Structure formats: C-alpha cells, structure tokens
C-alpha cells in the first residue's frame, strides 16, 4: 500500500527486532503480486497482517502455486487508530474503512460504509469530500487538524503477522516461540 501504512510501520519494527539493517522495504498493493516477486527473485520476503481479508487465500496460493511458505510469525501493535471526521460535518453519514477493521467499531451509526484497500487512503478521501468519516490513524488527523477531527479513539490493536519466504521452516513439526515471552496464563498448562 501507500507509505505510512501499518504494514510499513510494523515491517520496520520487525526488521529492527531481527537486527536486519540493509533491507529495503518495497510497498505493494496486492499480496499475490508480492508472491510473484518472491518467486521471480525480485523480493526475498513478504510480511502480511494475518487479519487481512485475503490472508487465507495468500497462504494457500503461496504454498500450492509458488512453493513459498510462512517462515515466521509475530505479534505487533498497530499505529493508534480512530474515527476521523471532516470538520464541519455534524452528523457523519458515510464511513470509510479497510475491511479488516470493520469489527473495531459499531458501523451502524453511519448510513453507508465505504471499503478502501488501505487506511492510508482515507485521509485523502476525507479531505476531498469523498466520505464524512473514516477509521484511520490518529496521526492523519493530527497532520490535518485544521480540517479533520477525532470523534472516537480506537487505540492500537495487537495484530498477528506472517512472514513469507522460500525456505520452509516446518518439517512436519510444530514451530513456536521459545523466547520466554509466553503469557503467564499459558505457562500453567
């Protein structure tokens, strides 16, 4: 997607966590294109949030069509999110959101829901009058605070993420974290 997405934000955090300093992040709008890029040697890895509506399709396509596998998983909070509305709109009627975020709020308050492929497209649509409100980053509202306001703070979401690559890490056995960060309530089993 465009610059500033949670995918870019979280990918940067993941690379730093793994100590990878020389990687270049290339943003794409279509995960199937990303798989083709890995297959053709144009990319080494791809990161996808596991709550993305196309995730199951991407995992299956990666495995069965390209021989690409999920090689790592992790959990990371998103950017701070909220319902951002154009100033001057008293009763918002339209709400833009990325389909994976639909359960973050009660959408019944709006007459129409408009789906977009990235929350980073929402501020532009708000500023252009395409919709009244949108579920996007709070930093977008801050950047355009003269034109946009925050109606609801959603906060961050701890999302699961998948890393795709060519080298399969599972040889038929369970692969799980042994980093010692397992939540305490899971340790009692």
Segments predicted by a language model, with ranges:
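Domain-level signature for soluble enzymes in the chorismate/prephenate branch of the shikimate pathway
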Residues: 1-189
